[in-house]
Curated annotation (Swiss-Prot):
The gene is gmk. It catalyses: GMP + ATP = GDP + ADP. This is Guanylate kinase. It is found in: Cytoplasm. The lineage of its organism: Bacteria, Pseudomonadati, Pseudomonadota, Gammaproteobacteria, Enterobacterales. Residues 4-184 form the Guanylate kinase-like domain. ATP binds at residues 11-18.
Length: 207
């Protein structure tokens, strides 16, 4: 069985990466593609469900997991911790399922060091004006928080060149098509096709 591919997806807050990933998953069967559910110490936002969007834990629980080396990556963002379970990711990949990680550039660097075969995708907004509009459209944050998020977005975007692929999310449908194209191309790589069609290739080359 061909090993699944781990996809690292990063973007500044408001660029639409979560929406793109969710839209992609709706077009892919569960036995092909799944999204990693991270642990976090931040409070749930309206509509977020424990175990579906995140595993919400307190700081003591998170630190205990760090001490057990339970995370493939972890980072602090805006005073909250986020981490990805090492065991959960490796188990899913072993079944041939592709896994998507929605993480920031700090987590991406940690993942690439531990899993160099992972593929990484960075998503950019079409402009700062549009990014500001999207951040304000949530209607959840104060001006101070929005300013902080915009500054963080600029810092995040400065790492775009560290990734394998770049998508500009101007038109959502076009960006989604770009994301699907990346996945399709990766599945057609020689290394994965040789594993997937090993029996066929052996028969075709037999005397």
């Amino acid at each position: 069985m061909a090993q699944g591919t781990l996809y690292i997806v990063s973007a500044p807050s408001g660029a639409g990466k979560s929406s793109l990933i969710q839209a992609l998953l709706k077009t892919q069967p569960l036995y092909d593609t799944q999204v990693s559910v991270s642990h976090t110490t931040r409070q749930p936002r309206p509509g977020e469900v424990h175990g579906e969007h995140y595993f919400f834990v307190n700081h003591d629980e998170f630190k205990e997991m760090i001490s057990r080396d339970a995370f493939l990556e972890h980072a602090e963002v805006f005073g909250n911790y986020y981490g990805t379970s090492r065991e959960a990711i490796e188990q899913v990949l072993a079944t041939g399922v592709d896994v998507f990680l929605d993480i920031d550039w700090q987590g991406a660097q940690q993942i690439r060091q531990k899993m160099p075969h992972a593929r990484s995708i960075f998503i950019l907004p079409p402009s700062k004006i549009e990014l500001d509009r999207r951040l304000r459209g949530r209607g959840q944050d104060s001006e101070e928080v929005i300013a902080k998020r915009m500054a963080q977005a600029v810092a995040e975007m400065s790492h775009y060149a560290e990734y394998d692929y770049l998508i500009v999310n101007d038109d959502f449908d076009t960006a989604l098509t770009d994301l699907k194209t990346i996945i399709r191309a990766e599945r057609l790589r020689m290394s994965r096709q040789k594993q997937r069609h090993d029996a066929l290739i052996s028969k075709l080359l037999a005397d």
